[in-house]
Amino acid sequence: MKKHSARVAPLSACNSPVLTLTKVEGEERPRDSPGPAEAQAPAGVEAGGRASRRCWTCSRAQLKKIFWGVAVVLCVCSSWAGSTQLAKLTFRKFDAPFTLTWFATNWNFLFFPLYYVGHVCKSTEKQSVKQRYRECCRFFGDNGLTLKVFFTKAAPFGVLWTLTNYLYLHAIKKINTTDVSVLFCCNKAFVFLLSWIVLRDRFMGVRIVAAILAIAGIVMMTYADGFHSHSVIGIALVVASASMSALYKVLFKLLLGSAKFGEAALFLSILGVFNILFITCIPIILYFTKVEYWSSFDDIPWGNLCGFSVLLLTFNIVLNFGIAVTYPTLMSLGIVLSIPVNAVIDHYTSQIVFNGVRVIAIIIIGLGFLLLLLPEEWDVWLIKLLTRLKVRKKEEPAEGAADLSSGPQSKNRRARPSFAR
């Protein structure tokens, strides 16, 4: 099995969270080798002190990552659930899902400026915008961002990004947000299947089981409301959105690999530029053909549109750059936790019926998503854990028998001197 460096090689498409482009930076430094004095030091109190300090430092670093992980999970959950609910609310006054998609995608332009502000505030070696831009452009090749690269390596992802968001928003019009958020979690299963076929990722039986659970959950979700036209169309739209998202992710790994934070920020900003230059004509056509029509611009709920765009931008920022402070698995949990949040909101704001079939479908899809979060070496870790437990169980009876056998002997030894007197 191939083991990759965190900086040099791309993450497995299935191991990284949904739509994550970035890889871990700053972990390539080798551990400091012990000096001659440390090598000759006796394994005594000093060595034990150093080991305890290392363990304490390690535990503190892990606790810090877990703390940040909880914060990131809450941010991912709230931004994803909030954007979904706000989109549902927006469609009551503004029935234009593609226009909403176009408007929100334009905000992607802010990725690189926000990244550069963070770079100036945090980095010790500050670079100008031009220098940083040129350095990030190396991600696209030796020639940087040329017109050919723009149309061959950026434009297809811009189309997939737009389709993913449009299909998701259009599905919100047809079915409730709980079903939409649950079905979109099948994205992870589609990523595994595509990465197994296209990227030749390692075959894992548990992930095949997870993919089967996801497909079974989709079928059960369709059956939950009966085979009505709106329900079937809505479910088909969400599944198509999850498929576009999976295709986007796997193609990115195949064509571009993994990006550093600056490179990912530049790439996402380029998607925003592509959206402004080439997708703007579509909302205009939809408006004049009255497919997505509004009487006047004063009737547009600008607050809802801007709120949705900010929440979606926050979600993508945290999901793509949260890997700097915590584990990717914890970030993925935020998407799963948005399901009960949407369910509670739907329970009080809509006429959703949580019958047995729907609840089982939600549980099955959620279980499949969680199984896909298992690391590739999970079976090795499980075997080691079971082996340790067996060894401990064998040692405990042996220690108990040793204590029983040593008890009478010690009493006899203590009694002999007093008996001699």
From Swiss-Prot:
Expressed at the highest levels in the adult cerebellum. It catalyses: thiamine(in) = thiamine(out). Residues 25-45, 393-421 are annotated as: Disordered. It comes from the Eukaryota. It is found in: Membrane. It holds the Pfam family EamA. Keywords: Membrane, Transmembrane, Transmembrane helix, Transport. Signal peptide: none annotated. GO terms for cellular component: membrane. Coiled coil: none annotated. It is a multi-pass membrane protein. SUPFAM superfamilies: Multidrug resistance efflux transporter EmrE. The chain crosses the membrane at residues 66-86, 98-118, 149-169, 179-199, 208-228, 232-252, 266-286, 305-325, 326-346, 352-372. Residues 411-421 have a biased composition (Basic residues). One of its GO terms (biological process) is thiamine transport. Mediates thiamine transport. Belongs to the SLC35F solute transporter family. PANTHER family: SOLUTE CARRIER FAMILY 35 MEMBER F3 (PTHR19346:SF3), SUGAR PHOSPHATE TRANSPORTER DOMAIN-CONTAINING PROTEIN (PTHR19346). This is Solute carrier family 35 member F3. It comes from Homo sapiens.
